[in-house]
UniProtKB/Swiss-Prot annotation:
PROSITE patterns: DPCK. GO terms for biological process: coenzyme A biosynthetic process. ATP binds at G11, S12, G13, K14, S15, L16. Pathway: Cofactor biosynthesis; coenzyme A biosynthesis; CoA from (R)-pantothenate: step 5/5. This is Dephospho-CoA kinase. Gene3D superfamilies: P-loop containing nucleotide triphosphate hydrolases. One of its GO terms (cellular component) is cytoplasm.
Length: 201
């Protein structure tokens, strides 16, 4: 089993690339954003964790994500401590996900994790793929999500530069031109990896 990690700036198209690995290479994808969403929605321990740090963000046992975002945007020591605990939970889920797939006939696992390198999630990867888009396209994608300028700037500050990401990655995929172009890059990377490890799809 080969573990691929995706790194890239916010709005670079990591989830799109992950979906293409799933669709065209039959890779299984660990979507950290989706995992965190489910934890906020359904995990009583995480809901209590949120409440212990940010009481106003939990109402009648439900996490108010808009209120919680307010604390994220402050990004103070309290948030950093909370985030560290949450990351530990996500790390364990990711570890279990990888272990579970290692027991099946799974060839590729793709980790779609924000701050993959910054939070050291890349340490369990066999290869890291840098996903890159031009800055104008990134901003357009984020505006469609309704992201504020302040949120964009904060997240950008937390992330490595494109140069650092590229330096720490094995491959680069450029998004934003066409679906076929992205798919061809995905398939080319798989071909290169298979050549390195001496196996065939």
């Amino acid at each position: 089993m080969i573990i691929l990690g995706l790194t890239g700036g916010i709005g670079s198209g990591k989830s799109l690339v992950a979906s293409y690995f799933n669709r065209f290479v039959k890779a299984v994808v660990f979507d950290a954003d989706n995992v965190v969403n489910n934890l906020y929605n359904f995990d009583n321990n995480v809901i209590e964790l949120v409440k212990s740090y940010f009481p106003t963000s939990v109402n009648n046992g439900v996490v108010d994500k808009n209120d919680l975002k307010h604390y994220f945007l402050l990004y103070d020591d309290l948030w950093i401590k909370f985030q560290s605990e949450l990351h530990s939970i996500v790390w364990k889920i990711q570890k279990d996900f990888i272990l579970s797939n290692s027991r099946r006939i799974t060839k590729y696992v793709v980790l779609d994790v924000p701050l993959l390198i910054e939070a050291n999630y890349h340490n369990c990867c066999d290869f890291v793929i840098h996903v890159k888009a031009n800055s104008i396209l990134q901003r357009q994608r984020l505006l469609k999500r309704g992201m504020s300028r302040h949120e964009f700037e904060l997240i950008s500050r937390l992330q490595l530069s494109d140069n650092d990401r590229k330096r720490l990655s094995d491959f680069t995929i450029r998004t934003g031109l066409s679906k076929n172009f992205v798919v061809s890059q995905v398939k080319d990377i798989v071909f290169q990896i298979d050549s390195r490890v001496g196996c065939k799809i």
